[in-house]
């Protein structure tokens, strides 16, 4: 009996490579929500512009045996200097998406932040992925 063929994995080499894949897979409203910025998208444009100032510089023919991406943040050691940012309504993109994201972040040893607009209760996420941060929206000062 022949083994079932696995679906082909698209080649993703950079973050921008995810965009056309997401556009094909997600319903238009969900893609628009996650792809676009708020209001006139000035913050989105500013963030992209700021990251354009950075690049990775390969260093050829150097020793790599002692390298580590590990960092310490707030007394906790993480495997890499990046993590999973809060994704509003994460469960709309994948079944129990918030649990998937936070669980994978925990397995990879990187921080994850649960959105304040998560559809999964934070207690459920905290039990499944201890150490997950929470994006809290505090009420403003009425004075």
Task: Label every PLM stretch briefly.
Residues 94-98, 114-130, 138-143:
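Active-site-adjacent beta->alpha loops and helix N-cap segments on the catalytic face
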Residues 2-75:
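An N-cap/entry alpha-helix motif that binds or orients negatively charged groups
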Residues 99-106:
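Glycine-rich beta-alpha loop segments
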Residues 65-75, 113-124:
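Short, charged beta->alpha transition segments
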Residues 27, 84, 105:
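Conserved, mostly hydrophobic/aromatic
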Residues 86-92:
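Glycine-rich phosphate/pyrophosphate-binding beta-alpha loops
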Residues 82-85, 112-114, 132-136:
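Hydrophobic faces of well-ordered beta-strands that scaffold small-molecule active sites
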């Amino acid at each position: 009996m022949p083994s079932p063929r696995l679906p082909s994995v698209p080649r993703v080499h950079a973050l921008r490579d995810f965009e056309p894949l997401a556009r094909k897979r997600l319903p238009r409203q969900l893609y628009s929500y996650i792809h676009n910025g708020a209001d006139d998208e000035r913050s989105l444009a500013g963030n992209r512009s700021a990251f354009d100032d950075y690049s990775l510089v390969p260093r050829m023919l150097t020793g790599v045996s002692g390298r580590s991406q590990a960092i310490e943040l707030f007394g906790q050691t993480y495997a890499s200097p990046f993590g999973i940012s809060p994704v509003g309504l994460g469960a709309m993109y994948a079944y129990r998406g918030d649990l998937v994201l936070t669980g994978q972040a925990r397995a990879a040893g990187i921080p994850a932040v649960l959105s304040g607009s998560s559809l999964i209760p934070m207690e459920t996420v905290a039990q499944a992925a201890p150490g997950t941060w929470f994006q809290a929206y505090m009420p403003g000062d009425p004075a």
